[in-house]
Regions:
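Hydrophobic regular secondary-structure detector
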Residues: 1-171
Length: 171
């Protein structure tokens, strides 16, 4: 999907929006924004769900355009993106929940350890929750609205060269 600038921008938008969600949660729960609370945030994990939804939507849009032999209408585009989001929603949610569950034991810590690590765990869980919500709501809607025109699912030069290199080894 990186060949499609709109899809890449929609995926990238999840980072500031989930950070807004995170800072709102931190402010409402009086968690200070410091190195300990924000240090564990990993933008790769935050955009993971969005990447899954965007990849699936682009794949379905490209296949639908190829199948019809023309550009999709707005209704067809919305239908394909909805189907793509529905298809990827459950694995995405379970994957994000598994990562969130890893942080639950940290909430059982007491004393100095609890005071040190609670803000970090809270911040990561809130960021992942925000990213997950955005991935199943904002991302499909934005893809359906803004990814118009000819959609191609193609490998980039790097992937083609890598495939040429390792395909003979596998055979």
């Amino acid at each position: 999907f990186l060949g499609n600038i709109r899809a890449a921008l929609i995926t990238a938008m999840v980072i500031p929006l989930s950070m807004l969600f995170t800072f709102t949660g931190m402010f409402n729960n009086k968690v200070s924004a410091n190195l300990m609370s924000l240090g564990a945030l990993d933008f790769g994990i935050i955009v993971d769900g969005a990447v899954v939804i965007v990849e699936n939507a682009i794949r379905r849009l490209a296949h639908a355009q190829h199948r019809h032999g023309r550009m999709l209408t707005r209704a067809e585009r919305f239908h394909e993106v909805f189907a793509a989001a529905r298809e990827a929603r459950r694995p995405l949610i379970f994957g994000q929940l598994i990562i969130m569950v890893v942080y639950l034991p940290i909430f059982a810590l007491t004393g100095v350890e609890g005071k040190m690590f609670h803000p970090m765990a809270f911040t990561v869980v809130i960021a992942l929750l925000g990213a997950m919500l955005l991935s199943v709501t904002f991302v499909p809607a934005a893809i359906a609205m803004f990814v118009t025109g000819k959609v191609k699912e193609e490998e980039g030069l790097v992937m083609r060269k890598a495939r040429q290199g390792y395909a003979p080894v596998l055979e």
